[in-house]
């Protein structure tokens, strides 16, 4: 670890004192990223899961969740290449994790990124290695939302993931040029329309095969 990184982490600890991502309470110097009692409250993703996005599916006979199944069928029907390889999930979106994600995204709890990144590496280290990833590119926010929120939680997570894996992170390779509606409020068709033309990819991204 370089001296600059050490100084950055020390400053980050002063500005954003470590808090438990579940209860949001301050962590003692002897606690690492999360209170031990709070760790038990998180519901980890278990099989069976969607082979494409990693979300829990109802039965093992279902390879894909409903959204991914429709996407795969559309790609086959219209002979479009699906550049998306695979996604992984850490926790089921229920219980304590809902409040955690809300604070991470909207309440300036960017320090939660360290917990999510370490959990991801612990759970999927072998999968990450097999993917042979060239660069981590965080999903960009529209400049208007970025100004309002003050930070991009995807960048916080990407930076922490980069630090823990050694995979470089690159900002600016993809720009968000359309201020889209929140996807959670939209159905499958509306989501596709909402994201149409939302991003601009820079030519410099072509030097990377696995992102």
Describe these PLM feature segments:
Residues 1-211:
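Glycine-rich phosphate/pyrophosphate-handling loop used in enzymes and phosphotransfer proteins
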């Amino acid at each position: 670890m370089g001296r600059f990184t050490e100084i950055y982490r020390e400053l980050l600890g002063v500005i954003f004192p470590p808090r438990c991502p579940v209860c949001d309470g301050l962590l003692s110097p002897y606690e690492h990223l999360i209170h031990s009692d709070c760790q038990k409250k998180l519901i980890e993703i278990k099989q069976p899961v969607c082979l494409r996005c990693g979300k829990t599916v109802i039965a093992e006979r279902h390879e894909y969740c409903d959204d991914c199944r429709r996407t795969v069928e559309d790609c086959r029907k219209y002979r479009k290449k699906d550049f998306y390889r695979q996604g992984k999930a850490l926790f089921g979106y229920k219980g304590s994790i809902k409040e955690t994600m809300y604070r991470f995204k909207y309440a300036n709890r960017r320090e939660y990124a360290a917990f999510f990144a370490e959990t991801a590496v612990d759970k999927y280290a072998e999968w990450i290695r097999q993917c042979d990833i060239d660069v981590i590119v965080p999903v960009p926010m529209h400049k208007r939302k970025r100004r309002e929120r003050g930070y991009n939680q995807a960048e916080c997570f990407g930076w922490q993931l980069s630090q823990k894996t050694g995979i470089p992170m690159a900002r600016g390779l993809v720009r968000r040029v359309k201020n889209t509606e929140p996807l959670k409020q939209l159905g499958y068709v509306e989501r596709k329309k909402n994201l149409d033309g939302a991003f601009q990819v820079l030519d410099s991204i072509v030097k990377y095969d696995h992102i």
